[in-house]
């Protein structure tokens, strides 16, 4: 059976707008799935690059399938049991922050980039005072993000229209506030200039988010039968439940530039009051 690939999906090339730290099942069946629908509805027009933020693990399955994969949602919809299949084509590439550091770092220079999504587990948003700017990359997620943002700030000479929007989905309260605090501490630790700290405050947006969807992951016991049903081999299938909710709290209004609700998606925006 032929492996799922871009030729089979007819993937449309779009500008890379999202860098996503994490390539796990939840992000692929939630964020990437929603962006795929928003692209289809003509509301977003942007691709995602996945970043493997840890040293171990492999991206071979992603490269083999050119980052194309199927999401199957299963559950009760309008009182009826349903299975909804969707081939997700919103992911353009997957990069290893350790094994392909330069390729990863070069995305900081990408003009079209606007959003940083992350799911680095509940323990991922932590301040690590052993991180250093010269590390390629720093160990912690906030360390990687701080260096990435600093490289972008330098490349674009502090241009205020080149800031990024952070959309962390780690399951901790006030995830965006905690993430920004870590970044600010690292900027002080690394003696980064005041102009960068101003750019963080004025050009960048750190949202806090609340997410809800049960994602059951790769259906190991059913994968062979599902691939027969699909008519292609897919080693990246993700299963989950139809219900989803994404609440985005932001001190700056990003609803017009990231209009997922306009695509009929279960996303809502609220105003975030910063401490």
Briefly describe each language-model feature range.
Residues 1-272:
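Substrate/ligand-engaging "lid" and interaction regions
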């Amino acid at each position: 059976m032929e492996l799922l690939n871009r030729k089979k999906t007819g993937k449309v090339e779009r500008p890379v707008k999202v860098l996503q730290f994490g390539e796990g099942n939840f992000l692929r069946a939630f964020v990437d799935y929603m962006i795929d629908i928003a692209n289809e509805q003509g509301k977003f027009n942007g691709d995602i690059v996945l970043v493997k933020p840890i040293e171990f693990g492999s991206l071979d399955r992603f490269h083999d399938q050119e980052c194309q994969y199927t999401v199957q949602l299963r559950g009760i919809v309008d009182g009826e049991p349903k299975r909804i299949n969707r081939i997700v084509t919103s992911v353009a590439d997957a990069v290893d922050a350790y094994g392909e550091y330069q390729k990863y770092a070069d995305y900081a220079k990408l003009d079209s980039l606007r959003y940083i999504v992350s799911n680095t587990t509940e323990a991922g948003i932590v301040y690590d005072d052993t991180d250093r700017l010269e590390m390629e990359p720093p160990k912690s997620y906030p360390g990687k993000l701080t260096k990435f943002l600093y490289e972008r700030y330098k490349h674009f000479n502090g241009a205020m229209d080149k800031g990024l929007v952070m959309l962390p989905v780690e399951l901790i309260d006030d995830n965006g506030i905690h993430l920004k605090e870590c970044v600010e501490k690292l900027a002080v630790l690394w003696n980064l200039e005041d102009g960068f700290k101003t750019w963080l405050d004025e050009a960048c947006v750190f949202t806090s988010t609340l997410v809800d969807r049960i994602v059951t992951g790769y259906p190991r016991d059913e994968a062979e039968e599902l691939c027969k049903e699909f008519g292609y081999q897919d080693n990246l299938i993700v299963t989950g439940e139809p219900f989803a909710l994404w609440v985005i709290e932001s001190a700056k209004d990003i609803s017009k530039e990231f209009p997922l609700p306009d695509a009929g998606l279960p996303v809502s925006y609220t105003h975030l009051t910063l401490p």
